[in-house]
């Protein structure tokens, strides 16, 4: 494969070797502890689906606190809060633009980045074709390869997939690429997409690098001009957009994760500070990027943040 068009193969082992870490397993929510007989205050976090595993298996809640994590697509999370369906202490999203609309929060902090990749299943015939194709667009256009993606109306991964394809159409001078690739029967909720992938029902899928690393999926790296990871390409990313069902238009940009705190309890403050302040410790082993400059605060930030 051409290194630019196929962008090379990677896996969890290769990524962890590069960052020098090993991610722990487990499925239970993280909890701090108090002395015997005392009950730790619980802090609720409503989060992007791509943060769920890291928050529940890697994040160390501060001593004296417990966390409860509920995760969905970020666009759905934003609507749930905006419609008063949920009232969490902390909201953590995969796109800070959603804090401006449909939400309207006074402040938030960005704390991590990610990249789009194409994960593939080497155990299926279609997945094998992905590794053998001349380029990743050619691989995904193969009728024998079943492609999965998430719903752009429900989460940023879905609309970022559309962004990446639009950017790829320009990058490779293949203007029909997006129209040729996208079909409604490819769309799954995020958890169902991963289940289909694990069961062999989908040969390849657009996912965040963190999702592939966490689950040990082999994947193709995409060029920086396409994968929405590089601030140097921000102006090019911003040329693509998608309009959500509520009329909000989101534009392409480097993938950023952001969080806001909605309550002022000591426990919520402590958990929030740990979440944005130690993101590198619990997110980098899972394939996220946490730059040394993080966290960045925006808006009318309270003195206690």
UniProtKB/Swiss-Prot annotation:
One of its GO terms (biological process) is molybdate ion transport. The keyword Phosphoprotein does not apply. Gene3D superfamilies: Periplasmic binding protein-like II. Residues 1-40 form the signal peptide. Coiled coil: none annotated. One of its GO terms (molecular function) is molybdate ion binding. Pfam families: SBP_bac_11. PROSITE patterns: TAT. InterPro entries: ModA/WtpA, TAT_signal. SUPFAM superfamilies: Periplasmic binding protein-like II. Disulfide bonds: none annotated. Predicted to be exported by the Tat system. The position of the signal peptide cleavage has not been experimentally proven. The keyword Signal applies. Keywords: Plasmid, Signal. Belongs to the bacterial solute-binding protein 1 family. WtpA subfamily. Part of an ABC transporter complex involved in molybdenum import. The complex is composed of two ATP-binding proteins, two transmembrane proteins (HVO_B0370) and a solute-binding protein (HVO_B0369). This is Putative ABC transporter molybdenum-binding protein HVO_B0369. It comes from Haloferax volcanii (strain ATCC 29605 / DSM 3757 / JCM 8879 / NBRC 14742 / NCIMB 2012 / VKM B-1768 / DS2).
């Amino acid at each position: 494969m051409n290194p630019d068009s196929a962008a090379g193969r990677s896996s969890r082992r290769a990524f962890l070797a590069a960052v020098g870490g090993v991610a722990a397993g487990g499925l239970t929510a993280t909890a701090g502890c108090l002395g015997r007989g005392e009950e730790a205050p619980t802090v609720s976090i409503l989060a992007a689906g791509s943060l769920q595993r890291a928050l529940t298996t890697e994040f160390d809640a501060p001593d004296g606190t417990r966390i409860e994590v509920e995760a969905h697509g970020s666009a759905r999370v934003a609507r749930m809060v905006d419609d008063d369906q949920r009232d969490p202490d902390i909201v953590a999203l995969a796109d800070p633009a959603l804090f401006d609309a449909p939400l309207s929060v006074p402040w938030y902090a960005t704390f991590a980045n990610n990249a789009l990749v194409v994960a593939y299943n080497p155990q299926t015939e279609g997945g094998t074709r992905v590794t053998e194709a001349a380029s990743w667009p050619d691989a995904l256009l193969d009728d024998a390869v079943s492609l999965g993606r998430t719903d752009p109306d429900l989460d940023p991964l879905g609309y970022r997939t559309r962004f990446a394809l639009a950017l790829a159409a320009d990058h490779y001078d293949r203007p029909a690429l997006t129209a040729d690739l996208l079909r409604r029967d490819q769309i799954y909720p995020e958890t169902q997409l991963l289940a289909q992938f694990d069961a062999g029902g989908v040969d390849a899928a657009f996912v965040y690098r963190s999702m592939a690393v966490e689950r040990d999926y082999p994947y193709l790296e995409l060029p920086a001009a396409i994968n929405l990871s590089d601030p140097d390409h921000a102006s090019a990313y911003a040329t693509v957009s998608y309009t959500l069902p509520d009329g909000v238009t989101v534009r392409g940009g480097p993938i950023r994760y952001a969080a806001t705190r909605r309550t002022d309890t000591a426990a919520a403050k402590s958990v929030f500070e740990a979440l944005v302040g130690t993101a590198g410790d619990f997110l980098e082993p899972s394939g996220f990027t946490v730059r040394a400059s993080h966290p960045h605060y925006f808006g009318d930030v309270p003195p206690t943040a």
